[in-house]
Design a protein with these regions (language model features):
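Extracellular/oxidizing-compartment recognition motifs
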Residues: 1-345
Length: 345
């Protein structure tokens, strides 16, 4: 078993595979945004994982990505100062003869800041460069240029077992594009910002081609908290930008509260939060699939831009929430009320 905790959001990898849990159907599920939000002057949670299936005979590699989370991210407004992230783990392996091997995090571990996760922040989003995903967590990886870790003594509280249901991307709450509008520039409508110049509109499909200089606005039909998942096919180095909003600009009129052209996403309510996902393609010939893991967004609308032509498929709004079994249901003849209930759940 693997026991892990951290100051900041962490994801663990063994032999190149992200650590998760296998359900009865053989699917791998992942606890997200570990270790969760706590009053870190007092408490931080640890998580427990059965990693038997990920270990192999001979050499094994274990590592973790750690981002700011609720420790030193913008969301806590400096509550704990600017202290660095930290990760702590203990791997217990019971051998066939009954002996137990214990592998802790200690000063023999190595670290670097040159991986594909360039930035991860609850408020400000995630920046990921897939070109830098070069097998960092595999036994064959050359870590000769990594540097030594340092012991952290910044946390003075209790480390307790995670309480409550796991935070997961819940499949039954996925949202799919209702409409996709692709536009180039704006046109005048007599208002402050004008309106977007739509060149293509797609209905009820989650794949499209986006060219450099174009912008796509995707309407998922309902607000929720979570992130976008997608598959992208394009040349290596292509940079995608995803912004998120709960509503569109309706008229393009500043006096009516809009912050951009009619049809674009409204983001002024985010105030100083960047709430943006940046993804740089590796350039896989068959496409590459991705979703962030160090942040989440409240959104119904997604705005996408690209530095070069790209094909996007399987665009899905993932709802990330407490994974609890629904014990009852509620339905009315009013669809908006049903959507409100679903959103609250």
């Amino acid at each position: 078993r693997l026991y892990a905790t951290g100051l900041g959001v962490y994801n663990i990898f063994i032999n190149g595979a992200r650590v998760g849990q296998t359900d009865d159907d053989g699917n791998t599920l992942y606890d997200e945004l570990k270790p969760g939000a706590t009053e870190m002057k007092k408490t931080v949670f640890y998580t427990t994982h059965d990693v038997t299936a990920l270990l192999q005979e001979g050499k094994n590699a274990i590592g973790a990505e750690v981002s700011s989370g609720w420790w030193n991210g913008a969301i806590v407004h400096g509550m704990y100062g600017s202290k660095p992230n930290a990760f702590r783990a203990l791997l217990k392996i019971e051998l066939e003869d009954g002996t137990v091997q214990v592998i802790p995090t200690d000063l023999s571990w190595l670290c670097n800041t040159n991986g594909p996760l360039r930035k991860g922040d609850i408020y400000n989003g995630e920046t990921y460069d897939a070109r830098l995903a070069t097998g960092q967590f595999t036994p064959e990886f050359d870590d000769s240029e990594w540097y030594a870790v340092a012991e952290s003594n910044d946390f003075k509280g209790e480390i307790l077992a995670f309480e409550g249901p796991a935070i997961m991307a819940v499949e039954s709450l996925r949202r799919y594009p209702q409409t996709i509008q692709i536009y180039e520039g704006t046109k005048s409508n007599g208002k402050t910002f004008g309106s977007i110049n739509v060149i293509e509109e797609l209905t009820a499909q989650n794949n499209f081609i986006l060219k450099a200089g174009q912008t796509a606005v995707i309407d998922l039909g309902q607000n929720a908290s979570g992130w976008v998942s997608f598959t992208a096919k394009g040349i290596g180095g292509t940079k995608l930008r995803f912004r998120f909003g709960e509503m569109p600009n309706t008229t393009g009129d500043r006096s009516r509260g809009d912050d951009g052209p009619a049809g674009s996403i409204y983001t002024e309510n985010l105030r100083s939060a960047e709430a943006t996902l940046y993804y740089t393609l590796r350039g896989d010939a068959d496409g590459e699939s991705f979703h962030p893991t160090t942040t989440y967004f409240g959104f119904r609308y997604i705005e996408v831009t690209t530095s070069a032509d790209v094909e996007l498929t399987n665009v899905i709004g993932e709802t990330v929430t407490s994974a609890v079994e629904e014990k009852s249901s509620f339905s009315t003849s009013h669809e908006d009320i049903n959507k409100l209930y679903s959103n609250v759940m």
